[in-house]
């Protein structure tokens, strides 16, 4: 029985941080204090960076990118936030909606890719 306790504890500890890794729209719009507001901006920057890196990886490996941002454009945190919040408004998003999903949809709305001629 004791051989299962350590793996169970490890699993519980490994899963716990993953549940807290998402930021929801309500907590983004209404941070508890200035530190949470700063954290939200850092989180949004990280999500944007991850999406851009994944998009570049997809393109490099012959896949269809999720959005087609101009190559010479560098988005600021404020611009990224505006894209995400417009996406939330467009979709009538509720407070429990994930900020990352809203940003992805907003990037697709703001920087659509041209469809291939065959479609």
What do these predicted ranges mean?
Residues 21-85, 106:
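Short N-proximal segments of mature Sec-exported proteins
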Residues 15-21:
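Sec/Tat signal peptide C-region and signal peptidase I cleavage site
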Residues 82-118:
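Short, compact, well-ordered microdomains
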Residues 7-14:
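Bacterial N-terminal signal peptides
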Residues 1-4:
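Positively charged n-region of N-terminal signal peptides that target proteins for export
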């Amino acid at each position: 029985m004791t051989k299962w306790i350590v793996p169970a504890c490890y699993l519980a500890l490994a899963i716990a941080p993953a549940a807290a890794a998402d930021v929801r729209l309500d907590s983004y719009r209404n941070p508890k204090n200035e530190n949470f507001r700063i954290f939200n901006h850092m989180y949004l920057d990280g999500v944007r960076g991850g999406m851009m890196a994944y998009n570049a990886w997809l393109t490099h490996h012959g896949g269809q990118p999720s959005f087609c941002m101009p190559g010479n454009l560098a988005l600021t945190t404020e611009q990224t936030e505006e894209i995400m919040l417009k996406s939330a408004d467009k979709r009538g998003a509720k407070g429990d909606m994930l900020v990352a999903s809203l940003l992805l949809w907003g990037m697709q709305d703001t920087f659509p890719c041209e469809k291939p001629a065959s479609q």
